[in-house]
Amino acid sequence: MAASVWFVLAILLVALTFDFINGFHDAANSIATVVSTRVLSPTAAVIWAAFWNFVAAFVFGTAIAKTIGKGLIDLSVVDSTVVLGGLLGAIIWDLVTWWLGLPTSSSHALIGGYAGAAVAKAGFSAIIASGWTKTLVFIVVAPVMGFTLALLLTVALSWALRRSLPRRVDKTFRVLQLVSAAAYSLGHGTNDAQKTMGIIVALLVSSQALMVNFPIQAFHLTDANHIPTWVILAAHAAIGLGTLSGGWRIVKTMGQRITKLTPFGGFAAETSGAITLFIASHFGIPVSTTHTITGAITGVGAANRISAVRWGVAQRIVWAWVLTIPASAGIGGLSYLLLRAVV
């Protein structure tokens, strides 16, 4: 039993490692616009983003964590091996796409890997179909919402400031972009850290038969509706530290290769992305921060002129999105089968 308890604790560390990699992989989402507009240096930008990633722990609730913890996969199917297989599926896919410089979704890699491992164990009956509906719908809705809000905000602000001096506008939005970058990092922190919280809660609830005699009471969890404070703080700390580590390959794709940005455009993109993430977090919908900010950046470019968007780069990114859930599910399922054979 002792060995099994330590196995569960090791998986908990793997979950926090995924959260760290999530911050590392998705750092570009939070800082690409503010770096590409030269409002902040890369070093200052990652510190700014990481700080607000952690502050999000004290601002938002845990609706997304509950969706992940009990709303996507039948908890009666979940065990420590399923959770580990799912995490490995997500981590491997994240690292491959990071190496290739593709801003794919860590969020969808996680739920894909988790689902793949559960299906490998119990078949498709492990899937809670109702819980997947809003998640799959928002694969499309989140970037479209980001795109639409950014386009409308860019057009509205351009009209309102049409008689202002360009230099004054640039100076004003350099300051405002610090606020919009902080808001987006808050949204990124709460939406993505909560996904790891949900996985940790699913792990602890499904492992209570093993953990009941563990001396630390904080690890005793029988209700997936309760998210312990230490889980919230650990998840936000891990994603914040990951953001501090950066992710410069993807920054270039996100901030410069989709469309050229000014502080004005960066503000519009980040504000639109933040609003989208806040709405999704309020309703407990796990969305992709990558999809959201990419849609917003594209919306800013399209508002200026359609040719300002490098659609070839955007198309390559879309293909990475389409592949993420099935690819990570396949890796997660294979990881589960391999783990079951050796553990």
Task: Indicate where each model-derived feature is located.
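Multi-pass alpha-helical transmembrane bundle typical of ion/small-solute transporters
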Residues: M1-V343
